[in-house]
Amino acid sequence: MVPDAKHAPLPCPCGRPAYDRCCGRHVGTALPAPDAETLMRSRYSAFVLDRREHLLATWHASTRPAAIEPPPPGLRWLGLEVRQHRLTGPDAAEVEFVARSKLAGRAHRLHERSRFVRDQGRWFYLDGEIDPPVAG
């Protein structure tokens, strides 16, 4: 039996098939992400859905801002490409990604290598390098 469109799961903003089985398990819940890539995907979804509370809750206290500005009116996130996820230590990881968006009719591309740390068993976003150099 094929599910009808009214009951089909919503696609996840991060590009995976179903939000409720992907980033929806972490955005707005207490369930921690099992790894840095999953956390990064949930943070992208939080940007798409304007869930700033999730962004702040998953930002490490040592670098977390006091608040996050609302997105500019008309901003549309178009897609996420995860290029690399690697552990850099027992409690550290990097995720390189490209996120595409459109604002006021212009296409934008954010290429970032984000650093994550595991603190008391939970992964947190630490910081990121925009337009990182190509690894050689």
Swiss-Prot record:
InterPro entries: NTF2-like_dom_sf, UPF0225, YchJ-like_M. It comes from the Bacteria. Gene3D superfamilies: 3.10.450.50. Belongs to the UPF0225 family. HAMAP family: UPF0225 (MF_00612). This is UPF0225 protein Mpe_A2093. It comes from Methylibium petroleiphilum (strain ATCC BAA-1232 / LMG 22953 / PM1). The lineage of its organism: Bacteria, Pseudomonadati, Pseudomonadota, Betaproteobacteria, Burkholderiales.
